[in-house]
Amino acid sequence: MKLNRRSFVKTAGLGGVAITSSPFIDLLGNLPRKVEVQNPFNRVPVSLIIDDSTCLVNMAHYGIPQFAEVSPNQYKQDWRKLPREIPDTFVREFGEWCHENSVKGKYSVVPYPACTGWISRFIPGWTKKELEDSLNLIREVIVPDWDIHPEMVSHTRVIDIKTGKPYPDPTPAFMENWEWSQTKSSDELAAYQAYALSIIKEAGLPCEGLTTPGGYAARNQNNLALSTLQAVQDVFGAEIPHYFRDLFTDKGKSVAPQVLHASNLNGTDPKCVVSILGCTSDWFGDWDGLHPGSPDMFITEDLLSGRMVDVIDSAEPAIMVCHWPGIYFNGDKVGFNILKQVVKRLNQKYDHLVWMKLSEIARYWAAKELTNIKLDGNILTLNAPFATPGFTLKLNFNPRHPGLRIRGEEIKPFAKVNDKRAIKDHTWYSDKAGSILCFNLEKGSNELVL
């Protein structure tokens, strides 16, 4: 029985892949054989999305007056009291703490932050050396654990990419957060996004995806997906582009990544784009750094409830969302301290989480959704358009001596572990309910000999 992942999911929901013939006996007697793709390393992915970050500039200080010019009744914060800078000393403190505690995710670098200056050239108010040091800090401390995204060009005014200047009219029609993007074609969005991505590239930063500022393309999502695929591949050559646009906080609503516009899956140049969904609102310190949140919104002190508990217990990726000004909170670090409490509580409650970058989650979900799986006797064949580490399968039967064969090479036996928590690359676990196998899925043909 040969299934691609989309039909495979439907079958799995009714009991998995049913195989009626087999040369060996399993512990479940005559039940139909099932193969189901699990989470990576049999763990629940968790991640943190950081919006409104960039080099040096406090986006709240410079952004609020630009938003207020368009909507004066909505943006009444006293932006002059906010610091103009979020210092690199805090970037280092935050990045090093996250690294020590395995926290990973996405870190925006707004290319032309609130129209103050270009991260790849200069930003008035800071020296050239200060900007270079800030970029070096991001490369050395942030990049190892975080995906870098542009959050379009300025996050405030729309830029005329022919001139590099903001359009003259301060109206919703020419703000990145609001109306400009809602009626643009995929080619128009791709050109604008490529402009932002090219600044990230010129600054010497890696990138596989992008983040939308505010309501950017909220009513134009198909073109957003197509334009992300086009722009990220054109500028950076990323194999699996991804983007963050939406979050959902309603209990029971799926927040699983969405694999979109898959094509040429059996060819030499397969394509897709992945929409990453957040599962929380900003309950850290808000986008302006003026409204303290609470760790209880994520996970309560008794560890029994909260949005992260809901999502983790559903086994979907639990991806928190915050804004850099709220993490710094004008030097009081309110959001940062809330993050520390949340991570501490998650560690107290769970022992089956894995922190991942958004690109790592996107890659796994692309492989999970698009790999063709065929079980024939004691041979399980997986034809994968994309490789991914930690690919994990659950079988409702127990093989005797499972091994992996890649492209006709010798069979490499799996090492057996006696605890699910010990599952890692090229190991397997079994009990009365069946078995779990974990391995690095290679692009192309993979054979599991069971």
Protein language model regions, located:
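N-terminal export signals
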Residues: 7-27
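Active-site-adjacent pocket scaffolds in enzyme catalytic domains
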Residues: 30-40, 45-47, 53, 127-128, ...
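Active-site beta->alpha N-cap acidic-glycine motif
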Residues: 32-147, 154-156, 194-217, 296, ...
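Short catalytic/ligand-binding loop motif for oxyanion handling, primarily in non-cytosolic enzymes
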Residues: 55-58, 113-119, 156-162, 216-222, ...
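Well-ordered, non-membrane alpha-helical segments in soluble/globular domains
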Residues: 80-94, 125-135, 186-194, 223-232, ...
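C-terminal beta-sandwich/jelly-roll accessory domains of carbohydrate-active enzymes
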Residues: 368-450
